[in-house]
Amino acid sequence: MSFRGLSRPNAISGMGVADESKTTFLELQRKKTHRYVVFKIDESKKEVVVEKTGNPTESYDDFLASLPDNDCRYAVYDFDFVTSENCQKSKIFFFAWSPSTSGIRAKVLYSTSKDQLSRELQGIHYEIQATDPTEVDLEVLRERAN
């Protein structure tokens, strides 16, 4: 029995995780070359792929603007903040974005593929599942990170 190939397609949804997705996440995590990464499911390749990256100077508002109003996405965001002890910290948030206006098929597809992706992206500190912009307000991140 072989345990290699953890990025093989998920048995339920049939979606794997593209190598580029893992590499881009590592660039965000270790090299700080991205502020955020937005992922989408490419049904033709049966993989979760990178849709967009944000450079380190982009704001949280830029990140939110990159999430579609009517379709599901996954995303990771590198959140920098200062603690009450005045220490600079960084936490990585994983977002499962599933707006209420997205289609049922997309919601099911993204829901069944989420665990596979989050297993592949080692080093995520917090996960947020959101269906509308109020659930991804910057204050939500501040509360979770502190």
Swiss-Prot record:
Q: How is it modified after translation?
A: Phosphorylated.
Give the main location.
cytoplasm
Q: Where is the ADF-H domain?
A: 14-146
Q: Which GO biological-process labels does this protein carry?
A: actin filament depolymerization
Location comes to: Cytoplasm, Cytoskeleton
Q: Which GO terms describe its cellular component?
A: actin cytoskeleton; cytoplasm
Please provide the record's keywords in A-Z order.
Actin-binding, Cytoplasm, Cytoskeleton, Phosphoprotein
Keyword Nucleotide-binding carried by entry: no
Q: SUPFAM superfamilies of this UniProt entry?
A: Actin depolymerizing proteins
Please list the tissues where expression of this protein has been recorded: Expressed in vascular tissues of all organs.
InterPro entries in the record? ADF-H, ADF-H/Gelsolin-like_dom_sf, ADF/Cofilin
Q: What induces it?
A: By the root-knot nematode Meloidogyne incognita.
Residues where Phosphoserine occurs? S13
A single Gene Ontology MF term assigned here is: actin binding
Q: What does this protein do?
A: Actin-depolymerizing protein. Severs actin filaments (F-actin) and binds to actin monomers.
Record-stated family: Belongs to the actin-binding proteins ADF family.
What is the name attached to this protein's record? Actin-depolymerizing factor 6
Organism equals: Arabidopsis thaliana (Mouse-ear cress)
